[in-house]
Amino acid sequence: GKFSGFAKILKSIAKFFKGVGKVRKQFKEASDLDKNQ
């Protein structure tokens, strides 16, 4: 019912933030590499 829809939204938000975290980490590592070169 209502609650499962809410849980789905929470799950997709969590997934989104995980993806953003991964991208930010990769971006930071890439910029660190640029500094080192």
From Swiss-Prot:
GO terms for biological process: defense response to bacterium; symbiont-mediated hemolysis of host erythrocyte. Its main location: secreted. It holds the Pfam family Antimicrobial_3. The keyword Acetylation does not apply. One of its GO terms (cellular component) is extracellular region. It is found in: Secreted. Keywords: Antibiotic, Antimicrobial, Cytolysis, Hemolysis, Secreted, Toxin. Expressed by the venom gland. The keyword Secreted applies. One of its GO terms (molecular function) is toxin activity. Belongs to the cationic peptide 02 (oxyopinin-2) family. Disrupts biological membranes, particularly those rich in phosphocholine. Has antimicrobial activity against Gram-negative bacterium E.coli, Gram-positive bacteria B.subtilis and S.aureus, and hemolytic activity against sheep, pig and guinea pig red blood cells. Has insecticidal activity against S.frugiperda ovarian cells by opening non-selective ion channels. Enhances the insecticidal activity of spider venom neurotoxic peptides. This is M-oxotoxin-Ot2b. It comes from Oxyopes takobius (Lynx spider).
